[in-house]
Amino acid sequence: MLLIPAIDLKDGQCVRLRQGAMDDATIFSDDPVKVAAHWRDQGARRLHLVDLNGAFAGKPKNLAVIRDILGEVGEDMPVQLGGGIRDLDTIEAYLDMGLAYVIIGTAAVKTPGFLHDACDAFPGQVIVGLDAKDGMVAIDGWAKITNHNVIDLAKRFEDYGVNSVIYTDIGRDGMMTGVNIEATVKLAQALTIPVIASGGLTNLDDIRALCAVEDEGIEGAITGRAIYEGSIDFAAAQTLADELAG
């Protein structure tokens, strides 16, 4: 199973938000390129970027640093990015820059036609990010809970041709309370495309628990606060995941 380190970008810095609140950000580094290189050197095989300013503005806002990160690690591992991706031109520009995958979140829920077009135009390179609370999809930086059931919506997007689904359990993201294994497995079992777990990874027990259900269709897990605050040693965790996969 892939452990995917997250670099959340705000004003050119690497931060973590607590529960998606822009005004509750912890700055971990003012040199995200160095951070990306660090995770590569620790054995990461994929990198997860979020343009937080972009997510709130609806268009790319950290382009210079994203370009620099891709220049540093883009040849070594696939990089995926979400935040502010609202049109096909933005996707094309990012992929031309060396991004392996784009992640579409709120825009997929609000304008499913855009997601459909993106999957047609860039097959295999579009990941959908679904955030849910108690099984219902949330949008707009978690500000709004919709009446969409996460499994129903994910199945519909699977039919569009998305590469995979990043599933975030909102109750847990950035709160270090453990991954919602049950909800993640339920989603993975309903789909034939891979699910990437996100939100709440806190320690090696969470890694063990996820690896135990990897065969249900869970391809990886995104980790942020835990690897920055030191409750998970990234290299040790990836080694453990590889050993458990046998």
UniProtKB/Swiss-Prot annotation:
InterPro entries: Aldolase_TIM, His_biosynth, HisA_bact_arch, Isoase_HisA-like, Isoase_HisA-like_bact, RibuloseP-bd_barrel. Disulfide bonds: none annotated. Gene3D superfamilies: Aldolase class I. It holds the Pfam family His_biosynth. GO terms for molecular function: 1-(5-phosphoribosyl)-5-[(5-phosphoribosylamino)methylideneamino]imidazole-4-carboxamide isomerase activity. Pathway: Amino-acid biosynthesis; L-histidine biosynthesis; L-histidine from 5-phospho-alpha-D-ribose 1-diphosphate: step 4/9. The keyword Cytoplasm applies. It comes from the Bacteria. GO terms for biological process: L-histidine biosynthetic process; L-tryptophan biosynthetic process. One of its GO terms (cellular component) is cytoplasm. Keywords: Amino-acid biosynthesis, Cytoplasm, Histidine biosynthesis, Isomerase. It catalyses: 1-(5-phospho-beta-D-ribosyl)-5-[(5-phospho-beta-D-ribosylamino)methylideneamino]imidazole-4-carboxamide = 5-[(5-phospho-1-deoxy-D-ribulos-1-ylimino)methylamino]-1-(5-phospho-beta-D-ribosyl)imidazole-4-carboxamide. Its main location: cytoplasm. It is found in: Cytoplasm. It is an enzyme of class 5 (isomerase). The active site is at residues 8, 131. Its EC number is 5.3.1.16. Transmembrane segments: none annotated. PANTHER family: 1-(5-PHOSPHORIBOSYL)-5-[(5-PHOSPHORIBOSYLAMINO)METHYLIDENEAMINO] IMIDAZOLE-4-CARBOXAMIDE ISOMERASE. Belongs to the HisA/HisF family. HAMAP family: HisA. This is 1-(5-phosphoribosyl)-5-[(5-phosphoribosylamino)methylideneamino] imidazole-4-carboxamide isomerase. The gene is hisA.
